[in-house]
Regions:
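Short, contiguous alpha-helical
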Residues: 36, 40-47, 58-99, 138-183, ...
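Positively charged n-region of N-terminal signal peptides that target proteins for export
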Residues: 1-4
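Surface-exposed helix-capping loop/turn segments at secondary-structure junctions
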Residues: 51-59, 124-134, 169-175
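Bacterial N-terminal signal peptides
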Residues: 6-17
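Acidic/histidine-rich, surface-exposed loop or edge segments in extracytoplasmic proteins
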Residues: 22-29, 89-103
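Disordered, low-complexity segments in secreted/periplasmic proteins that are enriched in proline
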Residues: 21-27, 102, 179-193
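Acidic/histidine-rich alpha-helical segments that form the ligand environment
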Residues: 102-138, 144-160
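Short N-terminal segments immediately surrounding and downstream of signal-peptide cleavage
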Residues: 22-44
Length: 193
């Protein structure tokens, strides 16, 4: 029980920090809604980042290090990760072969792979409730809380988005979350991202 409380507390902190806006006075936002809001923000930012980067920059990586991924490989890697985590959430095999999307090279293929991954995840995320977030589900050879898998999906996605931002800025492309938009930290948008 202590572990479940710690997991829930950690997820609540993560979800609240990841949400784009604080709730209005008197509004109560539960765990599932917080995670769903964070997912929607991640989906918007990553989708826009994939669409906004010019095709010529999909082969870009900031150094010749063979261990670094190109921009396109990061987009494919994120799609692969989403398929894996959302297959776990749904209790089904991943419809995408391991690292299959990371091997794609054209912008069109990678944008589609990311869109397909989000479409696959959308149902799992909309089915999330405060109650089932605590349920243990099969992951690998063991079990973990459904909310823990969602947390892994979000944290990996936020990491991938952060990396994409660095690549975009290196190529002179303003990342999505830096643009002024309603609900993004006010009329000036979120600066410094």
């Amino acid at each position: 029980m202590k572990q479940v409380v710690c997991i829930v507390a950690g997820l609540m902190v993560f979800a609240v920090c990841a949400a784009a806006q604080a709730p209005a006075a008197g509004q109560k936002v539960g765990l599932a809604t917080s995670l769903q809001n964070a997912y929607a923000t991640l989906k918007g930012n990553l989708t826009q980042a994939a669409e906004k980067m010019p095709e010529a920059n999909y082969a870009f990586k900031p150094a010749p290090d063979p261990d670094l991924r190109t921009y396109g490989q990061w987009i494919g890697h994120q799609a692969d990760n989403q398929f894996t985590n959302c297959a776990t959430l749904k209790g089904v095999p991943s419809p995408s072969p391991a690292q299959g999307n990371e091997k794609k090279v054209t912008k069109a293929e990678l944008v589609k792979a990311l869109a397909d991954a989000f479409a696959f995840c959308d149902g799992a995320m909309s089915a999330l409730t405060d109650q089932n977030a605590l349920q243990l589900i099969k992951q690998g050879e063991g079990e973990t809380a459904r909310g823990g898998v969602v947390s892994a999906l979000l944290s990996h996605g936020l990491e991938s988005y952060g990396i994409a931002v660095v690549y975009m800025r290196a190529k002179g492309v303003a990342p999505p979350a830096a643009a002024p938009a309603a609900g993004r930290g006010g009329p000036a948008g979120r600066r410094g991202q």
